[in-house]
């Protein structure tokens, strides 16, 4: 074999010796080169003497053959080739999908009937459904806000307020497109969050103009005066709200990239709404408002009456019992805050996609054919599930990248992946299907089978991940095995993965060099001869008449384990010697797979949490186990997965929260020229935070990344009510009113706008909260519940604290 390899390699070398000049012409000289016809290979002389000529065709079979498959792919039970296309940044997925479909339709016309093209899934379908859902939430919120404005303020006032919404959106979307973000999932959510906020400015201005028009017959003057009276207050309130969102742009890591377009959108919408509230809203009010009092009493009339008759009286009594009210308020504050320990913590929820992934790991050393057989057996059961529409198999490899945070794994013969495309996404049906698949495949001993749902957020490890660090592989294997057994015993821990204990069994060829020398074996040729016998050796290229290149592989007929010792090698005397005469063939454990973490050896043990179980609770139990475990010398552990991502992301968000608070406080100090009044305004924040905890506790939702973002958003939102109240109090004091009457009058006149802005903000977020799915529900619940509790604090606690910490001139004590 070695002789044939050397002969063919020399024959296939493509060398240009040089050129020859003949008069005015120059000719390149070509002596040999790549094979161009099968006959050339067949007729190659491998041995010749005076008696005979032996050609390659006399001792070998020369033929075209397919390369041995390293992985297999199937769709609808038939072999396929999967093609995927990824979208470039700043391109439209719908236009891209349409262009691809046109190309596919044209290409289909050129195919024979034996080849079909089928679409497994289109990401644009999910995007379209999600975008339509967000726009539905937006329209529903818009309708709710409009109806609330209509019921509260009347038709003319509601029209003026509602006009501000589309104009603010159009201006902001233009700015958003100019900034390079465009409309995407997070920016649309930003529009929904901003929906309830952007009308606040228009409501406050409209309500102020509505009050002023009763004092004068000059509607234009009333509009200008009403807007000017609250101009600084709404400007300050808008800036503080923007300050709650702007620091989110500094959030590092993949999480920051994921959410970045949302704060940009909110800030741009709020800026547009402020410009409209200070300019267009007074103009429209001067044109549309009626000079005559409407005969139809709006809800604003009854709310104003309630505030003037009952609320002021109750507040006056409560202000006489300041100590009791403050103690009661802070007891309630701490009681709500204590619920945080009972609220679960998570990072990102399920993606709610109509697809499932199933990882299949057959035992080490499994052949590709065996893995293929196991996976096809799995499809027999999966096809009985009515909710499954399509099944795609990749045997010996993972699927191409089909979701933004799903990274394909390195392919091996003992690994495969199934993609299940469901008829639709229905949470109840998906949960039933996942439970059925896990129950069925958990009893299979042919392979380790993991059923996975897609998750939201950036790329992370499995939610529960422990990294064991040590330079001792034996220690890593032992501790990882103990830890894996512990995690497997924890209720709710599923999809356990601990790859370090997995090692292939290898066939080791132990050479007896003395026997090899006595047999006349050239040791240098031994490895190459065995390679040719088992895998084949590439010796050159074959070029057909069309210019296509094909590698030439020389190999022996395949041998099984029993025939391995019969492989022969030609010794120096030209005799065929079976390798079994000088080689001992034995089985041995191969190298253990392990990872590196910061250049140190690492074992990774990871798992998922079942839907009804908390990742944090399981992680806490794992940490408790490791803390009580006697780790070998030099070994330590690190937490990865959701715990690591949460610490990184929440640490960044905590810094953002601090920056937000400092920025808002600085703005308030500049506005009120006081340190104590901003502190009074800031009392709204702890009540909003504890209200958010109460909302999560009541709804049973976890404190997630989106909930944290909602909490930061509350910082800027809830202080607006207190700003308006304290600012109006200062204006009343500037008109030489006594302190308590000034506070009571401010509380009465601002009761309606505070109530209405709170209700409209809640109304704008209500569709997203109820229908936006598991990713957005915590955000909506946090803002809504925080607003409700902080509004109560604005109506009771802020007036009491304002009386305590404000002099009769409205300045700091």
What are these language model-derived features?
Residues 120, 127, 131, 206, ...:
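Helix-loop junctions and hydrophobic alpha-helical segments within the transmembrane domains
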Residues 143-211, 268, 666-750, 755-772, ...:
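Hydrophobic transmembrane alpha-helices and their membrane-interface caps
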Residues 195, 199-209, 231-250, 257-297, ...:
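Transmembrane alpha-helices and their membrane-interface boundaries in multi-pass membrane transporters
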Residues 177-178, 249-257, 326, 330-366, ...:
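Transmembrane helices with small-residue packing motifs
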Residues 230, 297-349, 375, 389, ...:
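Signature of alpha-helical transmembrane segments and their immediate interfacial
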Residues 1-143, 206, 224, 484-660, ...:
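Extracytoplasmic/periplasmic membrane-proximal domains and adjacent transmembrane bundles
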Residues 1-13, 32-34, 370-459, 515-536:
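Solvent-exposed, membrane-proximal periplasmic/extracellular interface segments of envelope transport
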Residues 262, 686, 775, 779:
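Structured binding elements
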């Amino acid at each position: 074999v070695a002789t044939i390899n050397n002969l063919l390699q020399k024959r296939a070398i493509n060398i240009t010796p040089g050129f020859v000049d003949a008069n005015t012409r120059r000719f390149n000289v070509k002596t040999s080169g790549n094979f161009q016809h099968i006959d050339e290979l067949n007729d190659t002389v491998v041995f010749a003497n005076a008696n005979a000529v032996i050609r390659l065709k006399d001792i070998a079979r020369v033929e075209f053959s397919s390369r041995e498959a390293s992985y297999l792919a199937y769709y609808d039970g038939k072999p396929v080739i999967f093609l995927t296309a990824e979208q470039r940044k700043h391109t439209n997925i719908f236009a891209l999908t349409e262009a691809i479909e046109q190309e596919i339709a044209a290409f289909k016309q050129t195919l024979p009937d034996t080849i079909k093209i089928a679409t497994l899934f289109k990401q644009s379908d999910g995007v379209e459904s999600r975008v339509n859902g967000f726009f539905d939430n937006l329209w529903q919120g818009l309708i709710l806000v409009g109806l609330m404005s209509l019921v509260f303020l009347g038709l003319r006032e509601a029209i003026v307020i509602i006009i501000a919404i589309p104009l603010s959106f159009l201006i902001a979307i233009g700015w958003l497109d100019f900034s390079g973000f465009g409309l995407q999932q997070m920016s649309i959510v930003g529009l929904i969050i901003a929906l309830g906020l952007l009308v606040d400015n228009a409501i406050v201005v409209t309500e102020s103009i509505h009050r002023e028009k009763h004092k004068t017959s000059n509607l234009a003057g009333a509009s200008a005066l009403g807007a000017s009276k609250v101009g600084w207050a709404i400007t300050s309130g808008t800036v503080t709200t923007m300050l709650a969102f702007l620091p989110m742009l500094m959030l590092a890591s993949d999480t920051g990239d994921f959410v970045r377009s949302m704060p940009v959108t909110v800030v741009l919408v709020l800026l547009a709404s402020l410009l409209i509230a200070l300019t267009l809203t007074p103009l429209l009010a001067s044109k549309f408002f009626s000079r005559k009092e409407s005969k139809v009493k709006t809800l604003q009339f009854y709310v104003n009456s309630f505030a003037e008759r009952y609320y002021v009286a109750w507040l006056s009594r409560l202000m006489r019992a300041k100590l009791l009210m403050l103690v009661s308020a802070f007891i309630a504050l701490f009681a709500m805050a204590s619920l945080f320990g009972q609220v679960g913590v998570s990072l990102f929820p399920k993606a709610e996609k109509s697809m499932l992934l199933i990882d299949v790991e057959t035992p080490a050393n499994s052949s590709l054919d065996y893995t293929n057989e196991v996976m096809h057996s799995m499809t027999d059961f999966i096809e009985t599930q009515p909710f499954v529409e399509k099944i795609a198999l990749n045997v010996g490899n993972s699927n191409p990248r089909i979701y933004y945070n799903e990274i394909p794994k390195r392919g091996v013969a003992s690994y495969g992946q199934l993609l299940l495309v469901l008829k639709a996404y229905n949470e109840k049906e998906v949960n039933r299907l996942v439970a059925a698949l896990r129950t069925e495949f958990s009893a299979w001993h042919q392979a380790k089978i993991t059923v996975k749902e897609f998750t939201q957020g950036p790329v992370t490890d499995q939610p529960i991940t422990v990294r064991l660090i040590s330079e001792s592989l034996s220690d890593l294997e032992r501790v990882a095995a103990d830890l894996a057994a512990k995690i497997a015993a924890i209720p709710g821990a599923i999809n356990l993965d601990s790859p370090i204990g997995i090692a292939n069994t290898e066939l080791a060829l132990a050479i007896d060099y003395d026997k090899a020398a006595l047999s006349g074996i050239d040791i240098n040729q031994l490895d190459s001869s065995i390679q040719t016998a088992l895998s084949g050796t590439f010796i050159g290229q074959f070029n057909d008449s069309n210019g296509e290149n094909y590698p030439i592989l020389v190999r022996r007929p395949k041998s099984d384990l029993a025939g391995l010792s019969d492989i022969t090698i030609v010794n120096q005397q030209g005799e065929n010697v079976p390798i079994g005469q000088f080689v001992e063939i034995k089985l041995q454990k191969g190298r253990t797979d392990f990872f590196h973490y910061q250049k140190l050896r690492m074992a990774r043990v990871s798992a998922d949490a079942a839907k009804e179980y908390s990742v944090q609770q399981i992680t806490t139990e794992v940490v408790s186990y490791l803390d009580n475990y006697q780790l070998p010398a030099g070994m330590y552990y690190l937490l990865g997965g959701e715990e690591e991502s949460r610490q990184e992301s929440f640490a960044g968000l905590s810094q953002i929260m601090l920056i937000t608070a400092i920025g808002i406080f600085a703005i308030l100090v500049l506005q009120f020229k006081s340190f104590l009044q901003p502190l009074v305004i800031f009392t709204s924040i702890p009540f909003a935070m504890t209200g958010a905890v109460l909302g999560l506790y009541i709804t049973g939702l976890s404190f997630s990344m989106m909930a944290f973002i909602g909490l930061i958003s509350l910082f800027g939102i809830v202080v607006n009510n207190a700003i308006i109240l304290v600012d109006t109090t200062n204006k009343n004091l500037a008109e030489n009113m006594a302190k308590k009457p000034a506070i009571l009058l401010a509380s009465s006149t601002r009761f309606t706008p505070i109530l209405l802005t709170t209700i409209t903000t809640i109304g704008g977020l209500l569709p997203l909260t109820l229908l936006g799915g598991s990713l957005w529900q915590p955000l909506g619940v946090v803002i809504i519940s925080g607003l409700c509790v902080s509004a109560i604090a604005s109506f009771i606690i802020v007036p009491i604290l304002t009386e305590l910490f404000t002099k009769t001139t409205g300045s700091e004590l």
